[in-house]
């Protein structure tokens, strides 16, 4: 998020989390949960989507984490298609033009966009930076910005979703920078 005033940093990996930085200062909030968007309910959940997701470890139903974390992505795929694949196998299927994997990844991007639309509508960040293992899927960046535009309140969304610069070490670098 270098060079931006309002940054929403996202982790999509084993879990889902986030952080907010305004004018290069991390915003923690009264309860120190600022940016904890993994436990908002996926906006606009359909009955079909409710069928193919497990209850979140936090005890609630429909948390974004159960849809867009790596384990959530593979769990939803396995429930829908009666398989036992991990996210890497699903992505391999996508690369090989396997129909179920293509469907799953397009749905993943839609779920990610719906979750990020809440962030955009409330925070209106300059940029959203994705990190974590799932952020390494290049197909996300080919589609997420256009998909996000369908769900935000404005017709002229300027916020961009971008990949982190430092790869899997981005979180460690950020923590070190803050200490």
Locations of the language-model features?
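ATP-binding/phosphotransfer module of carbohydrate and carboxylate kinases, centering on a glycine-rich
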Residues: 1-4, 44-179
């Amino acid at each position: 998020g270098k060079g931006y005033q309002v940054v929403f940093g996202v982790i999509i990996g084993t879990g889902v989390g986030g952080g907010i930085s305004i004018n290069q200062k991390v915003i923690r909030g009264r309860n120190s949960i600022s940016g904890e968007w993994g436990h908002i309910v996926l906006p606009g959940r359909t009955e079909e989507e409710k069928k193919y997701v497990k209850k979140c470890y936090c005890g609630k139903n429909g948390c974004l984490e159960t849809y867009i974390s790596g384990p959530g992505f593979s769990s939803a795929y396995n429930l829908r298609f009666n398989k036992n694949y991990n996210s890497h196998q699903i992505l391999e299927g996508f690369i090989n033009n396997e129909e179920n994997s293509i469907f799953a990844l397009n749905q993943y991007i839609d779920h990610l966009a719906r979750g990020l639309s809440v962030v955009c509508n409330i925070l209106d960040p300059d940029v959203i930076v994705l990190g974590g293992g799932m952020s390494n899927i290049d197909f996300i960046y080919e589609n997420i910005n256009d998909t996000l535009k369908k769900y935000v309140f404005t017709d002229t969304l300027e916020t961009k979703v971008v990949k982190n610069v430092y790869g899997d070490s981005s979180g460690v670098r950020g923590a070190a920078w803050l200490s």
